[in-house]
Amino acid sequence: MYYAVDYYADMGQISQDCFAATQTGASDFDMDELDDLDQVTQVIGYHPQFHDHFLATQNFIMKGDGPLPNDYRYYLAIIAAARHQCPYLVKRYEKEFINQGGDSAWLGGLDFIPAKLRAIYDINKILAHRPWLLRKEHIERLTKGKNSWSLSEVVHAMVLLSHFHSLSSFVFSCGLTQKLDGLSSPKLKSPPAAVAALAPTILITPTSPTEPQKGKPVLAEISLNNANPDYDSQTAASSNGGAPPDSANAVADGPDATTLNGYLATAQQLPQQHGISVETLMERMKVLSQKQDECSEAELSSRFQKVEQQTAELAAVTPEAAVGVPTNLSHYVDDANFIYQDFARRGTESINTFRIQDYSWEDHGYSLVDGLYNDVGIFLDAKFRAAYNLTYCTMGGIKNVDTSKFRRAIWNYIQCIYGIRHDDYDYGEVNQLLVRPLKMFIKTACCFPERITTKDYDSVLVELQDSEKVHVNLMIMEARNQAELLYALREIMRYMT
């Protein structure tokens, strides 16, 4: 069996914590004021190795050869983003929809679109929140009758929907739902590489204070740091009776990264959580890498179920009931009460998991999607590889650190949230390497991204560099994207056979 651990080889360092920021209503955006190079692209530009693959994939599925007409493509982007109440993406693709010659009446909502397009909405809803509920019968209903879809069209639609569901997670996690006015962080930044290349006259470095300038990169305007500058890791530690974290125990992962106390602070901000130093984390990774004993299949299964059940018991960072869908997005949303429910339930004796050994991207999904939608598999595969392998091999100034164990724990934990088990993986490593607050943020970003607030970030992260936060959010986006596609493509395969 060809597992992901072999497929995505040479996996390296990734930041230990995640970033969250505030959300605002769709009315905050004037799309005419956005640069041609949109904010999402600029943020992803912190990581050029991934940036190129992301843009190539998005351009292909939106503008390249494919079975769906342009108006369908852009409308699918709108309704996918609306499931997560993401005004930034909805407003952006409403504008693109009109620019592509779309019927403005469709922007009145789901009651104003063709019956054929309306028919795929249930799949949009299921993929966004509970992809394990998708069945081959959903595919069959789409491909039969008066307004039927071809199988190639269904695949194209599923690729689009999963892309924009996952992109919504990224947008909220990176604070791109915020207005640009008055949100500059007190921490100085360097611009993403991709942005710097496009604007060579503008340079903002951590050591060269720069006054706000008209036309400077979006990341110099958007606050991607702790919204409460008076809160620091020392305060967090002392309030819990612990010693202030040593700045030498910082973790870094990015070309502009210097120090990072966030990993320590996340653990120390909860009294019941014991923080670990970077040295301890590195030692754990080393021990896990050297471990020779192999677990039985029964033990591996038991450890997966334990982590999955712990995930079900883990509240999102904002567990209270979700607010209603904003009125300026509600016309794109049907059955708003259909949201994520934990795949695993505490006390269940058997859990119907999605086993990668039975259906994997590498052995099954890639060839199926590429066969039904020419060349898209190549783009998706390159994007997944880039996200999984992205590395600067640094940790708190220490170079040439192999943290593949840590990154694999993050990727597999994200897919565990969706009931996917990598059969060859020891899920005991997840609890060794990922602290509880990090798990909480990952779960929220995947399942309830619209709930992420500055308060959540304040209580979890301290002094992270922009590139580090973006790095983790890329992992969340791509692992989720792949999880949705695995469920979708498996049901298409079942329908075809």
From Swiss-Prot:
The modification Phosphoserine is found at S185, S190. Highly expressed in muscle-enriched tissues (at protein level). Associates with the GATOR2 complex; the interaction is probably direct. Associates with the GATOR1 complex; the interaction is probably indirect and mediated by the GATOR2 complex. Functions as a negative feedback regulator of mTOR function. It is found in: Nucleus; Cytoplasm. GO terms for cellular component: cytoplasm; nucleus. Belongs to the sestrin family. Residues 226-255 are annotated as: Disordered. Disruption phenotype: Sesn-null flies do not exhibit developmental abnormalities. However, fat bodies from third-instar larvae contain more lipids and adults also contain more triglycerides. Flies heart function is compromised with arrhythmia and decreased heart rate. Skeletal muscle undergo accelerated age-related degeneration. SUPFAM superfamilies: AhpD-like. Gene3D superfamilies: AhpD-like. It comes from Drosophila melanogaster. GO terms for biological process: cellular response to L-leucine; cellular response to leucine starvation; negative regulation of cell growth; negative regulation of TORC1 signaling; positive regulation of macroautophagy; regulation of foraging behavior; regulation of response to reactive oxygen species. GO terms for molecular function: amino acid sensor activity; L-leucine binding; oxidoreductase activity, acting on peroxide as acceptor; peroxidase activity; protein-containing complex binding. PANTHER family: P53 REGULATED PA26 NUCLEAR PROTEIN SESTRIN, SESTRIN HOMOLOG. Residues 226-241 have a biased composition (Polar residues). This is Sestrin homolog. Induction: Up-regulated by reactive oxygen species/ROS generated, for instance, upon chronic TOR signaling activation. It holds the Pfam family PA26. Keywords: Cytoplasm, Nucleus, Phosphoprotein.
